[in-house]
Structure formats: C-alpha cells, structure tokens
Amino acid sequence: LSSAASDVYKRQLHAVCDALLGAANMRDIGYHFPDTAGEFKNIDSKILLKKTVELIAGKGYKVGNIDATICAERPKLKAHIPLMQETMAIVMGIDADDISIKATTTEKLGFTGREEGISAYATVLIEKTD
C-alpha cells in the first residue's frame, strides 16, 4: 500500500478494533491500548487488531463478520481493498469473504470533502463460542 493508503488502512483497523471491543462490551481501543503507554506508541495497527481478537476471545467471542467503510476523497482505495481484506482476514484468523470494506466520499462535503481528514466506521458481528 502507498503511504497515504496505509494511513487510511490504519484508521480502518482502529475502527474495527473499536467495533469489536464495543460489541463485546469491553470499552474501546484507547482503554486497552493507550497511546500514552510506551508499548503501544507507534505500534503496528495489525498487532492491535490481533490483540483485540484475542481479548474478545478471552471473553468467549469470535468474529462473525466485519462491515467497514472508509470515507475519504483521497487516496482512491478501490484497488487496495482486496489486499486490505486479505490482510485483515489473516490477522483475525477468519475468511476474507467475511470482511466487507467499502470506500466512499462525502461528495466534497465536510472536513473529509475538503480533504482535511478521513473517517472510518465499522460494524461487526461477534458470536459466542460457548
């Protein structure tokens, strides 16, 4: 992935972590992995995703599926989505077919439309393993 696409992907991974933790009623990514703690400062977001999956597994859950949306004018992400899905699947130990990643824009509206930033959202289904 390009540097810009990697930054966007990082935001998406954080959104997925937050959604997984929220679905398991385990607070959020900042609670478990504060960037003020030296061990988490500049950590690879894929490691956080793996640790998040381990945390929810410890509470008796597994990932069912992921529906993620990235909202950005740039970079254009369509060509990168299959690699993003495959990488996430490997990290989480699930099938890439259980991960939907969509890229959209705000049609030039708001801070994302002005290219001042991006946003990422995720909805997840987790299932009890017991």
Region roles according to the model:
Residues 21-25, 53-61, 82, 89-94, ...:
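Generic secondary-structure signature for well-ordered alpha-helical cores
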Residues 10, 42-47, 80-81:
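Glycine-rich anion/phosphate-binding loops
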Residues 112-130:
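C-terminal edge-of-domain segments
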Residues 12-17:
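Short alpha-helix carrying the canonical HExxH Zn2+-binding catalytic motif
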Residues 20-62, 73:
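Glycine- and Gly-Pro-enriched alpha-helical subdomains that act as flexible
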Residues 1-9:
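Single conserved hydrophobic/aromatic residue that forms the stacking wall/gate
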Residues 67-72, 76, 82-112:
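Short, conserved loop-to-beta-strand elements that form functional interface hotspots
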Residues 6-7, 35-40, 108-112:
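A short glycine/serine-rich beta->alpha loop
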